[in-house]
Amino acid sequence: MIEYYIFYFVVKNYQAIYYLYLLTKKEILIMATAQTQFENFHSKILMGYDDNEPLRDRRDTLIQELKDKLSSDVPNMKFFHQGSYSLHTGINPLNGNPDIDIGIIFECDPNDEDYQNPLKLKKIVRDALNTKNRTVKIKRPCVTVEYLRDGEPIYHIDLALYSCEYGDSDGQTFLARGKETSSAEEIEWQISSARELTGVILNKYTDSSHKKQFRRIVRYLKRWKDEKLGHKNTPSIGLTVAAYELFSANFDFVTGKAQDLLALLSLVNSMLNNWGGDDRLHMYLPVEPFTDLFERMSDNQMKDLKTKLEKLSAVLIEARDQPDTHEACKLLKAQFGDDFPVPDKSETTKSSSSSVVPAGRSA
């Protein structure tokens, strides 16, 4: 054990001496990390579902209503959380109307004659929950319950309905797809492994600090999307899976502190480097049905996404190379919106909020 601590001390001091050497040789860059500001930004945009009592209460009410109102003729149900709630990557929406995604597994075989048409169960759920204090709509992937105040939406809950093979709720599940105006080809039970998706993504990171940085980076991208992309066809789950596939944790070599700016820059550049020969970004679900999460984006929307990612990359590089944290944060605020804090000029110095990297470090 003593030998270990001696070795650790020598290595750490060697690192410090090496950085001092590079500094004297002018082979090192002084840069603003803005880590404090990134973490403050994260605290502002973080959606803490368990702290959102009204939304949590409405979720519990809906689940209880379904248990109470559905007749005994309807197959047994099991509920589970999915989406950003289960991944802990949710953000406060810019214009309000936060949501929770709930999965409902009905213990029925999708080939059962009574439930071959997935719209049957969707209509049963809609009719059970349709009361005067909310609107309930059947959408292609789910049933959406929306709560209004003065005619404006304040919360919504998406209920994704599943059946299970052979009526075994632990077996393969199938998502009820289609709405009442869908064509016959669009109404189907689609094979889906939504329950497994959360574990696949989060189990990739065994280091808790890496997992926390992953979640922060996903939230930054989501808020950036809300600020910069006007179209809804860039799904948040696509950005989350892009991070799952391409994210690399980044921590200071000497101090061990997180460097979210560099981790985000690396991810954005990796996304751009993965643009295909068809001038599109393809990101596939890592579980069945392995769909391309960006397939519904038009070519113009895809072009817009690429252009704005290129701009984000350029701004992140400029902020990285900016020695003054105040100036760096002004650049970042233009990308991430008013919730990104900019410290007073008098509060920032090169020594207080900056880090060092060897010159020529790749973006």
Can you annotate each of these PLM segments?
Residues 91, 153-219, 357-359, 363:
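Extended, alpha-helix-rich binding/interface surfaces that flank or overlap catalytic cores
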Residues 2-97, 106-120, 362-363:
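N-terminal regions immediately upstream of nucleotidyltransferase
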Residues 2-6, 10-24, 28-40, 279-363:
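Terminal (often C-terminal) interaction modules
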Residues 98-107, 194-202, 219, 240:
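Glycine-rich, often proline-containing surface loops adjacent to acidic residues and nearby aromatics
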Residues 209-322, 327:
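Conserved nucleotidyltransferase catalytic core and NTase-mimicking acidic/glycine-rich helix/loop elements
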